[in-house]
């Protein structure tokens, strides 16, 4: 047993050393261009003005049970502005500019900074490679990307100096762990502003971004069409395949297979396959009943593609 543990430890170290030299790879070739995300961030800065700062944080990781997490999905607004898919990240938009030290050497005045998890070879041997600061700037087109530890030690001293408006998301109770540690200094500043009736006006940036998201760009429409096409193919195949004696979960499995076979990452929402009396339950997702001859089967399933989802009515 001890020998096996030692061998496993050596193997993990070898993998970690290999990962240290490997950079993040984008396997997908149809992603929305980084220029589109850049234009969105610029639009936000134009709307909030020179005397404001906007802060957005990534969606929290969620635990399924014990030490098993749900597959991570980025918060919609954060993804809309960055295209970044990793957890524990923070986006700062500063229209008037802020001076940062990139790669611990080059000093530069920028309007946007993305704080990300540091590269960690051992962690990456378990969960896959991370963007890191280099990947965030190169692949996402960020003006500056710094590791999360730099935020509290460097930026909180000067970030909010001289501003009139602070656009900051409320920190909700499901924000825990590393993300909570990252955003807590901002929440403490917000709480201080509320208590001392500061001259800084607090505003929620989500409403502004939601308004932007109402109007879809040509790139988004392409993604929506792709999601729709995937869903239509799956629905048509499911209608030809369903038969008495099948179970609702078999139909669900067929949808999942057909979605992912076409490149979809997730369902757009939990898949509903209700047969017989279950067909009138609006959000039924138990999907365990046997489908009998003469049953009406209602399927409400949609593919999500690059964070967009659309469906064809069944």
Enumerate the language-model features and the residues they cover.
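Short amphipathic alpha-helical leader/targeting segments
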Residues: 97, 238, 245, 308-309
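A composition/biophysics-driven feature that prefers long, compositionally simple stretches
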Residues: 2, 11-233
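A broad detector of the eukaryotic-type serine/threonine protein kinase catalytic domain
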Residues: 210, 236-240, 277-278
């Amino acid at each position: 047993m001890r020998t096996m543990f030692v061998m496993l430890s050596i193997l993990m170290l070898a993998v970690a050393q290999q990962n240290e030299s490997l950079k993040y790879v984008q396997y997908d070739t149809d992603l929305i261009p980084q220029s589109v995300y850049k234009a969105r961030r610029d639009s936000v800065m134009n709307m909030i003005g020179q005397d404001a700062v906007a802060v957005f944080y990534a969606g929290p990781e969620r635990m399924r049970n014990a030490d098993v997490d749900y597959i991570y999905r980025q918060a919609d607004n954060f993804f809309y502005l960055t295209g970044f898919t990793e957890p524990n990240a923070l986006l700062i938009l500063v229209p008037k500019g802020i001076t940062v030290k990139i790669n611990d050497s080059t000093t530069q005045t920028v309007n946007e900074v993305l704080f990300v998890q540091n590269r960690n070879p051992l962690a990456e041997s378990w969960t896959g490679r991370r963007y890191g600061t280099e990947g965030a700037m190169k692949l996402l087109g960020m003006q500056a990307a710094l590791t999360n530890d730099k935020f509290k030690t460097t930026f909180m001293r000067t970030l909010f100096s001289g501003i009139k408006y602070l656009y900051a998301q409320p920190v909700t109770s499901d924000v825990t762990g590393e993300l909570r540690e990252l955003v807590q200094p901002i929440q403490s500043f917000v709480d201080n502003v509320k208590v001392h009736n500061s001259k800084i006006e607090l505003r929620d940036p989500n409403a502004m971004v939601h308004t932007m998201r109402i109007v879809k760009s040509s790139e988004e429409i392409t993604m929506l069409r792709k999601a729709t096409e995937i869903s239509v193919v799956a629905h048509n195949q499911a209608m030809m395949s369903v038969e008495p004696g099948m179970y609702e979960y078999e139909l669900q499995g067929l949808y999942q297979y057909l979605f992912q076979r076409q490149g979809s990452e997730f369902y757009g929402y939990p898949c509903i396959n209700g047969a017989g009396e279950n067909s009138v339950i609006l959000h039924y997702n138990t999907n365990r009943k046997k489908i009998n001859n003469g049953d009406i089967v209602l399927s409400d399933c949609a593919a999500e593609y690059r964070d967009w989802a659309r469906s064809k009515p069944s």
